[in-house]
Design a protein with these regions (language model features):
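Terminal alpha-helical segments
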Residues: 1-146
Length: 146
């Protein structure tokens, strides 16, 4: 485990998925946009988690972020941790399942579930997650030294 390299790797993954989500939005591929936005947000959160330990192989990260934020002196970053946790909860496991499998109980395919508005919202959340993760990564080590 190399926290610095793991963090950089996850942030690059987040940027790549975010770029694909942006392209999907331009091409009106709503389901694909939400799917890539979910992965961008997930990897942004995993980049933050990687700073302090192993990255869990799960899609639900809000609990890990919450635990991490309680164990470290954060001062000005606590709002960022809260916001990132909320985003990963909204774009978590359920959204991941819906983009890949749809809603089996209602017999709705992923292409029937997602529209322009849901793609726009997911993309906005993914952008925020990526920006927040970058800010935490930039500022947190300095916070730790105090």
């Amino acid at each position: 485990m190399n926290p610095k390299r793991d963090t950089e790797f996850r942030l690059k993954l987040s940027a790549g998925f975010l770029e694909e989500a942006e392209e999907d939005m331009r091409l009106s591929r709503w389901r694909s946009c939400v799917d890539n936005a979910q992965m961008a947000a997930e990897n942004a959160a995993k980049a933050v988690i990687a700073m302090r330990g192993p990255v869990p192989k799960v899609h639900e990260l809000h609990k890990a972020l919450s635990r991490l934020s309680k164990n470290v002196r954060l001062s000005g970053l606590s709002r960022d941790f809260t916001a990132l946790s909320e985003i990963t909860e909204k774009l978590g496991f359920e959204e991941h399942i819906r983009t890949d499998y749809g809603d089996e109980s209602q017999y709705r395919t992923p292409w029937e579930i997602f529209d322009r508005e849901s793609a726009k919202e997911a993309l906005s959340l993914a952008r925020r997650a990526h920006d927040i993760a970058g800010r935490i990564i930039e500022q947190w080590p300095q916070e730790e030294k105090k």
